[in-house]
Amino acid sequence: MSATGRGNKRIFQDDYPTPAWPVHRLLEKVRLPAGTWVEPACGQGNIVKAVNQVKKGVKWVTIDINPEYPADLTGDFTYFDGAILKGLMPAKGLFDVCITNPPYKLAQAFVNQGLRIARYVVMLLRVNFLEGDDRQPWMEENTPSLAVLPNRPSFREFIDPETGKKTSTDACAYG
């Protein structure tokens, strides 16, 4: 689905691989500790690979809903309770960092779950995620830090098999 309503088809389970450069840019702007990180929508591992290219000392726990992906745990991250994650969590009880490019329609649930299980939560989301009256009370209690990527990441660069057309995202700011 396109932000401007041009009719692009949504990819199943919002599976849009994340390019390495926005992750690298984000890590330049945000200081995050080494330790145990969780990637709850890991897909093919693009974010894990990108982080590992520029940061040392990170141990990973990966999760994805799609059983075809090489994740440590398969299932819907937004429904996992502490018991499911406990065996994968560090001894101190929280992951050091939760980082992902969540399915946009589930972004709020991913953020909320991340806040429950990690000391730092990093989400690659369109800036317009912060808009909306329904998020106002949540934002007052959980005011996020924001790093804006001035170059537009494209998470949809693929050829549609039905039309043969290249498609991509069209929002102009990510944070």
Task: Annotate the PLM regions.
Residues 1-175:
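Class I S-adenosyl-L-methionine-dependent methyltransferase catalytic core
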